[in-house]
From Swiss-Prot:
Family: Belongs to the peptidase A1 family.
Keyword flag Membrane: yes
pH-activity dependence text: Optimum pH is between 5.5 and 7.
Protein name: Plasmepsin V
Residue intervals of the Peptidase A1 domain: 100-514
Main subcellular location: endoplasmic reticulum
Record's comment describing the protein's domains: The transmembrane domain is essential for localization to the endoplasmic reticulum.
Gene that produces this protein: PMV
Biased composition (Basic and acidic residues): 282-291
Coiled coil: 33-81
Purpose of the protein: During the asexual blood stage, plays an essential role in the export of several proteins into the host erythrocytes by cleaving the pentameric localization motif RxLxE/Q/D (termed Plasmodium export element (PEXEL)) located downstream of the N-terminal secretory signal sequence. Specifically, cleaves after the leucine residue in the RxLxE/Q/D (or RxLxxE) motif of exported proteins including RESA, EMP2, EMP3, KAHRP, RIF/Rifin and STEVOR. Also, by regulating protein export, plays an essential role in gametocyte development and thus, parasite transmission to the mosquito vector.
Annotated control of activity: Inhibited by peptidomimetic inhibitor WEHI-842. Inhibited by Cu(2+) and Hg(2+).
EC number: 3.4.23.-
Keywords: Aspartyl protease, Coiled coil, Disulfide bond, Endoplasmic reticulum, Hydrolase, Membrane, Protease, Signal, Transmembrane, Transmembrane helix
Amino acid sequence: MNNYFLRKENFFILFCFVFVSIFFVSNVTIIKCNNVENKIDNVGKKIENVGKKIGDMENKNDNVENKNDNVGNKNDNVKNASSDLYKYKLYGDIDEYAYYFLDIDIGKPSQRISLILDTGSSSLSFPCNGCKDCGIHMEKPYNLNYSKTSSILYCNKSNCPYGLKCVGNKCEYLQSYCEGSQIYGFYFSDIVTLPSYNNKNKISFEKLMGCHMHEESLFLHQQATGVLGFSLTKPNGVPTFVDLLFKHTPSLKPIYSICVSEHGGELIIGGYEPDYFLSNQKEKQKMDKSDNNSSNKGNVSIKLKNNDKNDDEENNSKDVIVSNNVEDIVWQAITRKYYYYIKIYGLDLYGTNIMDKKELDMLVDSGSTFTHIPENIYNQINYYLDILCIHDMTNIYEINKRLKLTNESLNKPLVYFEDFKTALKNIIQNENLCIKIVDGVQCWKSLENLPNLYITLSNNYKMIWKPSSYLYKKESFWCKGLEKQVNNKPILGLTFFKNKQVIFDLQQNQIAFIESKCPSNLTSSRPRTFNEYREKENIFLKVSYINLYCLWLLLALTILLSLILYVRKMFYMDYFPLSDQNKSPIQEST
């Protein structure tokens, strides 16, 4: 009975010991984790303070530079054209990012923000500190308290400017998009600075911007932090970025251009870059001997030939004359006041116009990933591309079926049917494999033998649209970058911008498209900044704190289990002696 009582008592003590040990070890773990987190936060604050000091030093240096520049400008009466341009690197692509973005500085001291370049909208906005419904982006939410020049646009019931609504004593920012998503928050003003990589002068001005307090859909998951709209100001509307930019820099021509490649590109403020024009680069290398005996100052016409070996050449044997003279840019009138709409009058495939309308208003929009066209035009293009899409080169039946096609058997006869058949034969011969991904989008292994499209603009000018542009690189394939229009809104998106210099002349209200070799900028080459978003890393192991806590708990349980086994062994030795020890002295004597 006594032995039983002793065992029960000791097991009760053991239970209490185990409970206290677990509680102690767990609290120690939490305290250590919190200490680590606090240390990392302190380091982050120190880095931010250093960033502020650097920003103040930059401001002082900028003032000195501006004074020196003013003195230099007074002495220099002649400027080079290149010095009048401000160039900004664009990052991103069509496949991974679905947009192109640039970095600008907001506030004093500055905080860098990555912004999607969007010619289809007018707002400049990004998430701010305190937003609970915002996604995780490249930079931390903008902190208004860090900037000496930030000012929230407060209101009292109905005294907001520009017809804005007053919500919660702040003027409401609200933006809706065609795919159904919304972002909203409040307006604030601050200094916007554009650091150019080719010009030491910085464009800087005050701008009313939107602070995101709620994000939805695509904005919630995008990597870039915000959006930079480049469209024009509506009557009585909030002044847009592009209008304020040229208003505060009257020395600049009200022209800007966008030049994007497969990866990255460039935004040019104040004009365009003729050195990027493809025709200029071809002239510098070597001109066709038969067509280019005259000097480069004359009109230059390039005959586009068969596309059997090079995707930069035409898809059929018929020569198509396209003017590529640098000094003879073909401009297209902007047909609407506040957005960049132009008229197109035809869309040719193998010499056949597949447009059933005389003209079509299309929005030139760098914020749209793909080019959106009317359903009937899309179906026509898709029909011919489907014939050229062969996913099984060993299927003799399907191949013979395509080879037996006649011009009369097609949905719409082609003017250059023989070139279409030649391209089909070459695709089969070269085994240019084609697969289909989501929504039946065709993807080819190579650009060879795929057709060029031609868009008819004003004055019957036909602009070439190459496969390297309307297709985009997806891993090792080239996929179609065309979609059916939504809400009856045709759009010339990034798959139209690619490999062209798109020039916006705001003074003359016109746009031009010039084939160009646009610069590439990989996102991996993008400079880092103190305010970029970083997941907190454990200083011991690069694992989450939950995993660290579990590791500590497992270690504690292992130690406790060892103690239990040791104590259990001691109990058995004390209260359950060996059989030889259980014999009494009397029994031994007998």
